[in-house]
Amino acid sequence: MASSVATLVKSLDKINAADFESDEAARVNAIAAAQKMIHRLQSGVERGIELTHQRSTVFPIIDVFEDLGLWEAWASQGHEISLEGLAQLSNTPLALNLLRRLCRLLTAADIFEEKSEDCYTPTELSLYMGDKTKGSQVSQGSAPGWVGSYTNLPIFLKETAYQEPLDPKKSAYSKTAGKSFWEELSQDPLQQENFGRFMSSWAKFKVPWPAFYDTESLVRGAEPGMPILVDIGGNDGTDVERFLAKHPGVAAGSLILQDRPAALKLAKVDQKIELMPHDFFTPQPVIGSRAYFFHAVLHDWDDAHALDILRNTVPAMRKGYSKLLILDIAIPRTGASLIQAAMDISMMSLLSSLERPITTWEILLKKAGLKIVKFWPDPRRYETLIEAELE
């Protein structure tokens, strides 16, 4: 029995992402299966320690490395480094044994690797966290305001008599920071830029939507001289660029990227794409586009505000011609993944908003005068593209 288990462990240890290079869905399923296997092997005490001690201590230390400038400085070198060398990269003098203890936790958590005693090797993750052009979701997601909102969520829910949080001005985040998430962004240009880069990085991680949605039908059915795609709240233009990459022959000006002026500053897009400042709480100025596209926008808002956004868009649509495309999480009736469920609680904590179940999407769109044509899940089963049109 012992030898067969040892053989199995060796086999499992050889599996890596390259084995699933051509099958993204299989890779995601393998991750889920591996995580479930770990949980089956752990005792209740072990899982409790993991949740209360192991995971909860990693994020603060990631933030310490961020404060010391170590992620960026190490990534710029990108090679093996000694403890002393790492200390020399710090923007602030620190005790060597303190750094050793911090590194011990981060290597045990596989954030970077321990090559030998007091010698470390970067990983894809640690290099990623040091690349400021990508706006790491790890460092952004472990920022004090975010972590504080998660920590304060139990207190916030108790103080609000365990009612579902749906007021964007009252959230666990606002309880922590003294202002809402959006208010803080609007008052802090640096934080707004960091958040924009974070969203850009997050978007690039996701499966490109033209890879699983029939964008060819949009181009084929488009009228000459009319807009084909309006990307509303599209940040740096990752999604509209992906559309253009698949359909490079579309006419200049037929693709439009809309967002707040501060967000559009991050957009470095092809000259065929028109940049247009727009507040999606005001009427959509582009009339009769083939498609209007929202990616990770509506999950930021409760139903009342989301309905307001939709009702400002619907009048611009043409019946029988225009499509409304929403790329967001659509939580299944059963069997939600951990990332889907965690994102829902994250939206609750930060914004008093939500990730919507499929049935909630159906009700919301119907109230806006829309009917769902089809749900298009991405291969990772994280997000779903909801195709809708006027009733």
Swiss-Prot record:
GO biological process entries: methylation; secondary metabolite biosynthetic process
Keywords tagged on the record: Methyltransferase, S-adenosyl-L-methionine, Transferase
A Pfam family assignment: Methyltransf_2
Active site: 299
Enzyme Commission code(s) on record: 2.1.1.-
Pathway membership: Mycotoxin biosynthesis
Cross-referenced InterPro entries: COMT-like, O_MeTrfase_dom, SAM-dependent_MTases_sf, WH-like_DNA-bd_sf, WH_DNA-bd_sf
GO molecular function per UniProt: O-methyltransferase activity
Keyword Methyltransferase belongs to the record: yes
Binding site for S-adenosyl-L-methionine: 233-234, 259, 279-280
Methyltransferase is among the record's keywords: yes
Entry-linked PANTHER family: O-METHYLTRANSFERASE AF390-400, PUTATIVE (AFU_ORTHOLOGUE AFUA_4G14580)-RELATED
Function recorded in the entry: O-methyltransferase; part of the core atranone cluster (CAC) which products are predicted to catalyze most or all steps of mycotoxin atranone synthesis, starting from geranylgeranyl pyrophosphate (GGPP). The initial cyclization of GGPP to dolabellane is probably performed by the terpene cyclase ATR13. The Baeyer-Villiger oxidation near the end of the atranone synthesis, which converts atranones D and E to atranones F and G is predicted to be catalyzed by the monooxygenase ATR8. Of the CAC's other predicted gene products, the reducing PKS ATR6 might synthesize a polyketide chain.
Family statement drawn from the similarity comment of this UniProt entry: Belongs to the class I-like SAM-binding methyltransferase superfamily. Cation-independent O-methyltransferase family. COMT subfamily.
Entry protein name: O-methyltransferase ATR12
Lineage start: Eukaryota, Fungi, Dikarya, Ascomycota, Pezizomycotina
